[in-house]
């Protein structure tokens, strides 16, 4: 039985995803297929006028920089066959440099730290870390601190999750970050944190109290304006806001087309676990070149939001983020398993690649959107571009008390352009009431969407397996290929008015279904549709048939 609780080993995610697909494929070949899908008639945004500002001034003083569109970067395979960003070798070299600069090793116990869960060890940790260029060992135990700021060239290491816990002091203010970097304005570099449990100590707050104070405060670990960072084999427990936040110094809401300056870059997060988070598990803002691997986020509290309105995601690639890879991660019982998005007054995350993800009992397994750019009266998004996802699973999405008005979805694509999805398995629960909602929705002016090798089963109480919304806010330029529907919703594929679509290689089987494939308008191409068990197998532009029209 699948649970995916806080003790789930995220190193098992790759095997879990493979087993759930129920068929095997070569990941290198699959990634090439996804790239080809993405490159079919890719749309690029209009150029945004650039202001010439010296780099040093921009990094240190300017609060806002303009968004720059870049092509989707390449993914490589390492020696073990694991997908990695093209810049991973550069980060590995910087890790070697970090190791050379932190040969001096100290133990916090030698500076008076006591892991009894009572003693305030803030001063001992500060003395051990000093000005950096040191590897700091934290032994087994529970070490209370009032917060920790790490300088450049710092290597902080415990004895493992559950063995070494760093816990926030009971008198620490609600805004306090448990661990962060030293210099936000000037920036830091070469910081590594690993083999720890980080406990934000939410119990120090009143039970019904909102758990965060706004901005990027109240988290377990925050990297703000950090270049070259690593977080490995670390657990985050009950943070007020985020478990792990890779971010700029401040969030920026100066409008679509702008990004915050002083973001973080070249950060690798691996084997992380988080639960009880008030907002999101792992999140990025206005940062680039981020790699998130073999991590698991589950069971948020949602306490950073008003009850019933908690947009608490397992993995959130948020405002202004660019060039982010998520590889073999998992999420459970979150609002969104993976959300790629932006607020209405910020630039959307772009150039995001998901390669292996398992979503279990999330409300919306995969949610791609640019809020405030969905309706025809809204301005078109300048920045919501470029998402690729390969080998992903949505298992049994559910209604959630986190966001009570949100109905479950396996995937929702809104406002984004250039989205390619390949090898996507969606599995429902035949005994669960999905209240006739669609399982996968392409909507709200999403354009240039390609779905290939997508399978649905067991959503018997849903309304439609794959719905492309038409009307005034219609999606457009949608290509569907190799779609398999096995005794799932009563309506297989539903394409609304004003949508240009192409469909090929669909196999749909149902018992007493309503229709297998319906399109209000003629489709550009339709071929190899094997549909049975529906009252109306095929309906295109009002004409029905058991064969291709």
Name the predicted role of every residue range:
Residues 144-146, 290-291, 347, 374-376:
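Flexible loop/turn segments at secondary-structure boundaries
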Residues 145-149, 161, 167-169, 202-208, ...:
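Short glycine/acidic-rich loop motifs that flank beta-strands on beta-rich extracellular proteins
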Residues 252-261, 374-381:
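Intrinsically disordered, low-complexity Ser/Thr- and acidic-rich flexible linkers and loops
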